[in-house]
From Swiss-Prot:
Cytoplasm keyword on record: yes
Family listed: Belongs to the eIF-3 subunit G family.
HAMAP family in the cross-refs: eIF3g
Function of the molecule: RNA-binding component of the eukaryotic translation initiation factor 3 (eIF-3) complex, which is involved in protein synthesis of a specialized repertoire of mRNAs and, together with other initiation factors, stimulates binding of mRNA and methionyl-tRNAi to the 40S ribosome. The eIF-3 complex specifically targets and initiates translation of a subset of mRNAs involved in cell proliferation. This subunit can bind 18S rRNA.
Organism: Drosophila erecta (Fruit fly)
Gene this protein is translated from: eIF3g1
Compartments (UniProt record): Cytoplasm
Protein name: Eukaryotic translation initiation factor 3 subunit G-1
InterPro entries xref list: eIF3_g (IPR017334), eIF3g_N (IPR024675), eIF3G_RRM (IPR034240), Nucleotide-bd_a/b_plait_sf (IPR012677), RBD_domain_sf (IPR035979), RRM_dom (IPR000504)
Entry-linked SMART domains: RRM
Phylogenetic lineage: Eukaryota, Metazoa, Ecdysozoa, Arthropoda, Hexapoda
One of the record's GO cellular component terms: eukaryotic translation initiation factor 3 complex
Stored PANTHER family: EUKARYOTIC TRANSLATION INITIATION FACTOR 3 SUBUNIT G
GO molecular function per UniProt: RNA binding; translation initiation factor activity
Keywords, comma-separated and alphabetical: Cytoplasm, Initiation factor, Protein biosynthesis, RNA-binding
Length: 269
């Protein structure tokens, strides 16, 4: 019987047999970098070589963290090297914790320091905006508010002597009434300033007619342009109505401006 001839295999087949199919994973460290080389099969069942490069950096950590990293691993990671294993461990997003002391916590809970809270308060609808920007300005809600304030101011002026409280001098002399040459009570005159240039007599009458009856109104106008100079005088028939007008209109928002209302100073004859 003739002898069986030995067929020599190729070098690649011998290497594949020696490594059991795939070469082992290797790790090398050079110049502060760690290179991990591994082999695997791709979708076409061909061997591929994958090289991962890691940059080695030193980090100062608390003692408890450093001690925890020396704990003995167990389970499937019993024989793993120090550090996370990509096959069994997934590193998630880093979360930074911030600790506040008691003083910072008190400041955070202070309602006055809260930027989300608006310090402005509307006098018409009690909203968190200035009265000049109120969407209900000039509507029935604004008119009702002015009527309520006028009634409250008039009632306070009448009931003040009965209650025994302090009565301003102008209310004490309201019954006397200093009449002028034309029968007009100059002590019941007020001056309204900070009016817009587009102000008209009709607007002025609309502004004060709900407070009380008037005997005369004067809107200062420029002789050349005919525009409002920014102030006006209103003479009420009763001094208590003039006092109510000052209480209601002083600081009131009108036509994107804040009105300033005060008693009219008597002219020196």
């Amino acid at each position: 019987m003739p002898g069986v001839e030995t067929i020599k295999s190729s070098w690649a087949d011998e290497v594949e047999l020696d490594y059991g199919g795939l070469p082992p994973t290797t790790e090398t460290v050079e110049n502060g970098h760690k290179y991990v080389t591994e082999y695997k099969y791709n979708k076409d069942d061909k061997k591929t070589k994958v090289v991962r490069t890691y940059k080695i950096s030193k980090q100062v950590v608390p003692k408890t963290v450093a001690k925890r990293r020396t704990w003995t691993k167990f389970g499937e990671s019993k024989n793993d090297k120090p550090g996370p294993n990509s096959q069994t461990t997934m590193v998630s997003e880093e979360i930074i914790m911030q600790f506040l002391n008691s003083k910072e916590d008190e400041k955070a809970n202070d309602p006055l320091l809260d930027p989300t809270k608006n310090i402005a308060k509307c006098r018409i609808c009690n909203g968190e905006h200035w009265s000049v920007n109120c969407p209900y300005k000039g509507t029935a809600m604004d008119t009702n508010l002015m009527e309520k304030k006028a009634s409250a101011a008039a009632a306070a002026a009448v009931d003040a002597p009965k209650s025994g409280k302090y009565v301003p001098p102008f209310l004490k002399d309201s019954q006397k009434g200093a009449l002028g040459m034309r029968g007009r009570d100059d002590t019941a005159a007020i001056r309204i300033s900070n009016l817009s240039e587009s102000m008209t007599e009709a607007d002025l009458e609309e502004l004060v007619k709900k407070i009380g009856p008037q005997s005369k109104m004067y809107l200062a106008r420029d002789k050349n342009t005919g525009l409002c100079k920014g102030f006006a005088y209103v003479h009420f028939k009763q001094r208590k109505d003039a006092a109510a007008a000052i209480e209601i209109l002083n600081g009131h928002g009108y036509d994107h401006l804040i009105l300033s209302v005060e008693w009219s100073k008597p002219q020196n004859n």
